[in-house]
């Protein structure tokens, strides 16, 4: 590309090919030494982005990230209670299923022996030996464990204490955080005169005149701290019959506001904490003739 050049000495203009840019020679008009302006052409210069123009973009990016984190946190806070409630509902359903399995095992025992098992067995001197929970092991698919237990010795004898840590999982409520590996059960019967489980006396099916669907068979007793093999349950004579009541001798639960119970007909459901004590007492008795409200 030609370069227009004016001699600084004589003022004459001329067209010079750009390949001579930066070279010196004699002016065609006056003969004076001249230097053609220009030189190697470099890469075109691009305008540099100033730090002041980049700052708003950085601020916007930070705002977007922080805003996104805030939204995630808010969503998590909103969803967490719903997730926890769903999990608790699932555990409550599993607890009801446990009570149903225990109730069905008791029914199978009754089908074989024509009576429900006693609350506990005793030796010749009347000393308590084993719980009903041990007696129904064969009906809970745990006959191998049952066959190893020395039924003629106390539950905590030298030969038997080794089995205390082998509690079947059906005896633990799913909401009990200490359940895995636990030796204590969350399920009990109400033991005492008037109930299905009156000491060491088995209860014939015909003795339940209030109706199987109106008589409690097994209840949740998470506050009782009961070793599963120990021949001990809730004492009917000492109960206040309050669902969720304080102390270790009441129907109690890991589930807020309810407790799981199983009936003699094999059904199971939850009782609300506000159930009147008179209703609870009526459900415990097997031959009291009480009127049970329809909603219970």
Language model region names:
Residues 1, 21, 76, 254-258:
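A short, compositionally biased
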Residues 1-51:
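Cys/His-rich metal-coordination motifs, chiefly Zn-binding "fingers/knuckles"
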Residues 8, 17, 81-84, 174:
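Short, proline-centered helix/strand-breaking motifs
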Residues 8, 28, 81, 97-100, ...:
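Surface-exposed alpha-helical interface segments used for non-catalytic interactions
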Residues 28-31, 84, 103, 137:
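Short, surface-exposed helix/turn micro-motifs that flank interaction/cofactor sites
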Residues 52-105, 111, 115:
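Amphipathic alpha-helical segments typified by the pilin-like N-terminal helix
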Residues 91-296:
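Surface-exposed loop/linker segments characteristic of extracytoplasmic
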């Amino acid at each position: 590309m030609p370069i227009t050049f004016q001699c600084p000495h004589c003022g004459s203009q001329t067209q010079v090919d750009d390949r001579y840019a930066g070279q010196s020679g004699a002016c065609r008009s006056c003969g004076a030494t001249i230097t053609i302006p220009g030189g190697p052409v470099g890469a075109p210069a691009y305008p540099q982005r100033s730090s002041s123009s980049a700052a708003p973009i950085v601020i916007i990016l930070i705002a977007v990230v922080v805003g996104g984190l805030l939204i995630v946190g808010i969503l998590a806070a909103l969803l967490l209670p719903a997730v926890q409630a769903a999990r608790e509902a699932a555990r409550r359903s599993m607890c009801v299923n446990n009570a149903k399995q225990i109730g069905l095992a008791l029914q199978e025992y009754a089908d074989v022996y024509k009576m429900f098992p006693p609350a506990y067995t005793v030796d010749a001197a009347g000393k308590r030996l084993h719980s009903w929970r041990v007696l129904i092991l064969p009906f809970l698919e745990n006959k191998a464990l049952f066959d190893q237990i020395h039924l003629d010795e106390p539950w905590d004898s030298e030969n038997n204490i080794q089995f205390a840590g082998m509690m079947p999982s059906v005896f633990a409520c799913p909401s009990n955080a200490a359940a895995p590996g636990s030796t204590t059960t969350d399920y009990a019967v109400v033991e005492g005169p008037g109930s299905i489980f009156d000491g060491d006396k088995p209860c014939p099916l015909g003795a339940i005149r209030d109706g199987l669907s109106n008589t409690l068979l097994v209840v949740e007793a998470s506050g009782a701290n009961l070793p599963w093999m120990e021949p001990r349950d809730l004492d009917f004579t000492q109960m206040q019959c309050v669902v969720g009541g304080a102390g270790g001798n009441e129907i109690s639960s890991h589930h807020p506001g309810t407790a799981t119970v199983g009936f003699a007909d094999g059904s199971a459901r939850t009782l609300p904490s506000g159930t009147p004590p008179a209703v609870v007492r009526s459900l415990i008795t097997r031959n009291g003739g009480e009127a049970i409200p329809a909603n219970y």
